[in-house]
Amino acid sequence: MSSNPDQSTEVLYSVDSYVATITLNAPERLNTISGRMLDELSAALLKANSDMSVRCIILTGAGRAFCAGLDLAAQMSGPKDSLGNMGNIGASAGEFDIRNAPPVVLHNIDTPVICALNGGAAGYGLDLAFGCDI
């Protein structure tokens, strides 16, 4: 089974020969994690885990880095909350469900995940790498 990746997202998903490949797709910013990427990554991991034809997941990054951590530029330009905290990574505390965070999803899925490090992994990117099985 094979499916073509959707190029309009920050996370690419494809399946070929029982292997799902999930690619962080923001090479121009070294695949730094945005709120949108968090949501798309969790959704892709859950999709692969629920697909009975997928026996293994490969997590990788596009370009010259795996993931350089959180997108601090977006955080600095985002709105400030009432406590002065900056950023737009994820939703407000009342709306964000930690059970949907990619490291938690990685810990809870049954399908083995291989991290294909194609370059640097820093901060949150290192958390993602450590969350993989291999």
Residue ranges and their predicted role:
Residues M1-A62, G78:
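Conserved CoA-thioester-binding segment of acyl-CoA-metabolizing enzymes
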Residues N25, L70, N118:
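Histidine-centered beta-alpha loop that forms part of the nucleotide-sugar donor binding/catalytic region
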Residues P5, G61-V105, A121:
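Glycine- (often His-adjacent) and acidic-residue-rich active-site loop
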Residues P102-I134:
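Glycine-rich beta-to-alpha active-site loop
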Residues A20, A44, A48, A68, ...:
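Small-residue (primarily alanine) positions within well-ordered alpha-helices
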Residues I22, L59, D71, L128-F130:
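Hydrophobic/aromatic residues within transmembrane alpha-helices
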